[in-house]
Amino acid sequence: MKIGVYGASGRIGKLLLEELKGGYKGLELSSVFVRQKCETDFSSFSHAPLVTNDLKAFVRACECVIDFSLPKGVDHLLEALLECPKILVSGTTGLEKETLEKMQKLALKAPLLHAHNMSIGIMMLNQLAFLASLKLKDADIEIIETHHNLKKDAPSGTALSLYETCAKARGYDEKNALTTHREGLRSKESIGIAALRGGDVAGKHTIGFYLEGEYIELSHTATNRSIFAKGALEVALWLKDKAAKKYEINEMFG
C-alpha cells in the first residue's frame, strides 16, 4: 500500500519517514507533503517518494494518508481528501468542530481513524480501563498524565480519551463528570485528571481505581516516540480493504 505522510517535518512525521525507509511490512512511502524544503535525504529509501507542496498531487500519489500535523493543516487536508478520497490515519489533536464534521463527511467515502494516541499499549490500556470501570463500580477513578515541559495542551488528548472511556463504561455525563481543578470534597460521579509537565518525558498515563482498603493502578509509559509512528502504520495496514467508515482505535482488538 502506498503511504503519504502529512506533517513530515514534525517529530512523529520524521519517525514515520524513518520507519518507511526500508518499507514497513510492505508499505511504500509514495508521497510527502512539505510547505518548505524537506530536510530528509530520500536517496537511501527503497522508493523515491513525491515530495511536494501541491496538496492535490500529494493526495493523488498515495492510497493512504498518515497525518501528524496541526489542526489548521488537517482542515486543508480534508478538503483535498473530500475531492479525492483516500484512507486516512490521523493523530492530530485539538481539532475544531468544523474539522471533525469534515472528517465525518470523508468517512462516507473512505475508511479513516482519528486517535489521540497511536501506540499499541495505549490501545490496550483503553480496553482495560473500560473493563475496570465497568466491573469496579464502587471505585473512585483518577487519571494522572505526565509529559515533557514543551507540551502545549493539558490535559493531554490521550488522558481525555481515557476519561471518555471510563465515563462511558460508568454511564456518566461526559460533559460534567470531568474534574481538572479540584477544590473541596470529591463528588461521587466524577473523574479527575491531573496533568504534570517536566523534563523530556515522552508520555506516561496512569488510571487509578480507588476502593476502601485497596486500589488498582493501570499505567502506560512511552519510552520512545517511535511507538506512535509504528502504531499509525499498523492502523494503516488494518484499514486496508475496510469499508468506508470512521473507525475507533479499540476496534483493532475486536
Swiss-Prot record:
It holds the Pfam family DapB_N. It catalyses: (S)-2,3,4,5-tetrahydrodipicolinate + NAD(+) + H2O = (2S,4S)-4-hydroxy-2,3,4,5-tetrahydrodipicolinate + NADH + H(+); (S)-2,3,4,5-tetrahydrodipicolinate + NADP(+) + H2O = (2S,4S)-4-hydroxy-2,3,4,5-tetrahydrodipicolinate + NADPH + H(+). It comes from the Bacteria. The active site is at H147 (proton donor/acceptor), K151 (proton donor). CDD domains: DHDPR_N. The keyword Transmembrane helix does not apply. InterPro entries: DapB_C, DapB_N, DapB_N_CS, DHDPR_bac, NAD(P)-bd_dom_sf. Pathway: Amino-acid biosynthesis; L-lysine biosynthesis via DAP pathway; (S)-tetrahydrodipicolinate from L-aspartate: step 4/4. Keywords: Amino-acid biosynthesis, Cytoplasm, Diaminopimelate biosynthesis, Lysine biosynthesis, NAD, NADP, Oxidoreductase. The keyword NAD applies. SUPFAM superfamilies: Glyceraldehyde-3-phosphate dehydrogenase-like, C-terminal domain, NAD(P)-binding Rossmann-fold domains. GO terms for biological process: diaminopimelate biosynthetic process; lysine biosynthetic process via diaminopimelate. NCBIfam families: dapB. Catalyzes the conversion of 4-hydroxy-tetrahydrodipicolinate (HTPA) to tetrahydrodipicolinate. This is 4-hydroxy-tetrahydrodipicolinate reductase. The gene is dapB.
